[in-house]
Amino acid sequence: MVIANSNIIFVAGLGGIGLDTSREIVKSGPKNLVLLDRIDNPAAIAELKALNPKVTITFYPYDVTVPVDETKKLLKTIFDKLKTVDLLINGAGILDDHQIERTIAVNFAGTVNTTTAILDFWDKRKGGPGGVVANICSVTGFNSIYQVPVYSASKAAALSFTMSIAKLAHITGVTAYSINPGITKTILVHKFNSWLNVEPRVAELLLEHPTQTTLQCAQNFVKAIEANQNGAIWKLDLGRLDAIEWTKHWDSGI
């Protein structure tokens, strides 16, 4: 996918990996970058606008846990304004296994809801033009960090959902791929709660191992966007971008 002159919606593009990815996207010159985030960050938005004044950057407050119908209303506002949207990035996520319901609501259900809502505008069965979904999942969807089983399971669920959306592309016209960062130096991983406090030092222990910066992750994220491979499972770890070959142990046969 060519980012230049495209219209992109980025959910949670104002913090951590999201903000650095927004910076890299803006440098590539999209026509519009629409940022949907629960928390407003005027300083970051101003920085992005200054980075490339030719890009129109718009912010809408958005919580991914709202009902699908509310998301559809917001997307209608965006589509009415832009007419077309090329790429949806779902990047909302929390890492706190004390918040079980919210972890599932944000990391998994939020991804499902936003993707479901945009199908109203993209689905070729409804006369839509199709589109591309990039879902930020996690390497914990491959192998869990067992001290945070709720977070790991929510990301595995998001990964499975993304793989299914990709396989439905011939029906909907909507392609999808997953972005799976490894341990990245963000506020998210510097301090977080393990499930039932099974390992109070889990964040500290993770950071004793090699990590990557948010910039390294963002630069590889943009490479994945440009590659635009339906069904790709991208691992973004230690400054590398690698396509994962999924091992199939069962097939529905349909």
Swiss-Prot record:
UniProt cross-references to InterPro entries, sorted A to Z: ADH_Drosophila-type, NAD(P)-bd_dom_sf, Sc_DH/Rdtase_CS, SDR_fam
Residues annotated as the enzyme's active site: 151 (proton acceptor)
Binding site for NAD(+): 10-33
GO biological process: alcohol metabolic process
Coiled coil location: none
UniProt entry keywords in alphabetical sequence: NAD, Oxidoreductase
Enzyme Commission number(s) of this protein: 1.1.1.1
One Pfam family from the record: adh_short
Residue positions binding substrate: 138
GO molecular function annotations of the record: alcohol dehydrogenase (NAD+) activity
NAD keyword on record: yes
Top class in the EC scheme: oxidoreductase
Keyword NAD: yes
Catalytic activity: a primary alcohol + NAD(+) = an aldehyde + NADH + H(+); a secondary alcohol + NAD(+) = a ketone + NADH + H(+)
Family indicated by similarity: Belongs to the short-chain dehydrogenases/reductases (SDR) family.
Subunit structure: Homodimer.
Annotated protein name in UniProt: Alcohol dehydrogenase
Source organism: Drosophila picticornis (Fruit fly)
Lineage: Eukaryota, Metazoa, Ecdysozoa, Arthropoda, Hexapoda
